[in-house]
Amino acid sequence: MNNLELERLLNEKLSTDRINDYAPNGLQVEGKAEIQKIITGVTASQALIDYAVAQQADAILVHHGYFWKSENPCIRGMKGKRIKTLLVNDINLYGYHLPLDVHPELGNNAKLAQLLGISDLQPLENSATSIPVWGTLKDPVTAEEFAQRIEQVLHRKPLICTENGPHLIRKVSICTGGGQGYIDLAAAQGCDAFITGEVSEQTIHSAREQGIHFFAAGHHATERYGIKALGEWLAAEYGLDVEFKDIDNPA
């Protein structure tokens, strides 16, 4: 497949024109024109790039790419090495950030909800492109049971604050990655629990004082599944050779 055609298909699938982001979505570093082998991963780290080189990949597709708003534009140091490796090996780099978080089928929130048994997702914000969402568990569970479920699914213990929440959890809000700032909105919307990737000092106070269970399950861990699903969709729809590579990150 042509590299620009691949960008067009991905942009269309993820409706990138509908979402304001603080990083460019699409083809970020241009490589060879024809693509057959794609490596997908959460972040365009040097380790992922080196793996793609070893696999003779034509492209890398990630959730966390480059050129973030307010980022130093100079191509040097760690950033220079990464981009140089891509250019020397003629590898295309595609990045999709918020459009992949919010996609109703392939998105990080949607895939994590599916894995945790949370259904009927609705926007938490008053917007069709709300970043956080909420849904319901078919069978209510205790906070301890929900923490165990998260650990079983993500293969890591979540950081939890479950001191003053309700006895049973049914209504759950999700914002994968660094979404801890949405806890107040989740509490205001009557959610029993809020799950995200990261935690800040003030997050715990918000959880305690507003009576909502809080689970921080890892930025990387909560965002594996959207990019993996996007790659699987490409392989199924267009016959491309796509491999997901998980570069472990405890954060």
Q: For the regions a protein language model found, what residue spans apply to each?
A:
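Active-site catalytic microenvironments in core metabolic enzymes, especially phosphate/sugar-handling
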Residues: 1-251
